[in-house]
Amino acid sequence: MEADLEVQSELEKDTIPIKIGIIGEANLDKPIYLAERMEYAVCTPFGKPSDVIIDGQIEGVNVCLLSRNGRNHDIMPSNINYRANVWAMRKMGCTHILVTNTFSSLRDTFQPGHLVVPNDVIDYTSRRAQTFYDGAVGSPLGVCHVPMNPTFCERTRQHLLSAAEELGFPTGSSGTVLTLEGPRYSTVAENNMFRKWGADLLSMTLCPEAILAKEAGIPYASLGLVTNMECWCAKQPNATTHEIIYIFKKQSENLQKVLITAIRNMAAEDWAEDILKAKILVCSNFANSK
C-alpha cells in the first residue's frame, strides 16, 4: 500500500530531480569532493548501515556516499548489512545507486587494471539476507518475487560506459559476476566450475546488493575494477590482498572520474519514466497483492 501511494504521488509530478547514491570501497569520500557536505547516522528497520551517509553535491547534483565495508574497511563481506545500506539510500531519497566493486578475473579478456560495467550476476552466497520482505517484526509487509532480468538498469549502465569512453578509459561493456561468500578466495576446482557456469569475474560484495536495490525500486549499476587474475590462470602468481589493495588505490582516481562524469551526464536527462518503472516493477510483484 505504501509503495502504491509513492508511485501515485510520483505520477502526479512532471519531472523528478535525481539524487545519486554511491556505494563503494573504504574512504570513498576522500577522492570525491562534495559541496555542502553533511554526515548522517541513518536508522533503518534492519539496523545500522556500514557507516554514516555523507550527503552533498557534485557539480550541483545531489549525491550520497557510503563506504560499503566501513571507512576503515573493518567489515568483512558476509557481515556487511546490505539491507540497511540500500534502505538508507532509499531513505535519503536516492533515485539511483551507482556502486564500485573490485573483481578478480576468470577470463583472459579481463586483465588487472581493466574497468568493467557488468550486465549480469550469479549469486553464490549462502549467509546473506536476500529480501526486505522477510516477515520479521519491523520489516515491510508482504512477499515480493522481484524479477531479476535485467539485473542492472541498462540506461544507467550505458551512462557509466559512455563516461568511461568519454574519458578514454578502455572498459568492458559486459560481464557476468559471480559473488562469493568470502572472505577466502576460491580454489582452482571452484574456478573451473565457475568458468563452466559462464562466470567471467568474481566479487564478494555485488550480491545481494544488486537484488536489494531492485527490490527497493532503485535503478542500480556497477563500475568494477579488475584487480587480479584468479588462480585458474597458471601464467600469473596468486595476488596477495596487499597487491589487490595497491592496484585498487592506483586506479581509484579513474573510477572516481568515471562516476563524476556519469553523474553530470545523467543529471542532464529526464529520468521520471525510468524511476517510476522501477517502483511499479516492485509493486506489481507482490504475491499477496489484491
UniProtKB/Swiss-Prot annotation:
Pfam families in the record: PNP_UDP_1
Catalyses:
a purine D-ribonucleoside + phosphate = a purine nucleobase + alpha-D-ribose 1-phosphate
Q: Into which EC class is this enzyme placed?
A: transferase
Which InterPro entries does this one have?
Answer: MTAP, Nucleoside_phosphorylase_d, Nucleoside_phosphorylase_sf
Major localisation: cytoplasm
Q: Please spell out the taxonomic lineage of the organism that makes this protein.
A: Eukaryota, Metazoa, Ecdysozoa, Arthropoda, Hexapoda
Source species: Drosophila melanogaster (Fruit fly)
Functional summary from the UniProt entry: Purine nucleoside phosphorylase involved in purine salvage.
EC number(s) stated in the UniProt entry for this protein? 2.4.2.1
| Keyword presence, Repressor | no
Record-annotated disulphide pairs: none
User: Which GO cellular component terms, listed alphabetically, does the Swiss-Prot or TrEMBL entry include?
Assistant: cytosol; nucleus
Q: Which PANTHER family match?
A: S-METHYL-5'-THIOADENOSINE PHOSPHORYLASE
* Gene3D superfamilies named among the record's database cross-references: Nucleoside phosphorylase domain
Biological process terms in GO annotation: L-methionine salvage from methylthioadenosine; purine ribonucleoside salvage
Protein name (Swiss-Prot/TrEMBL): Purine nucleoside phosphorylase
List locations, semicolon-separated. Cytoplasm; Nucleus
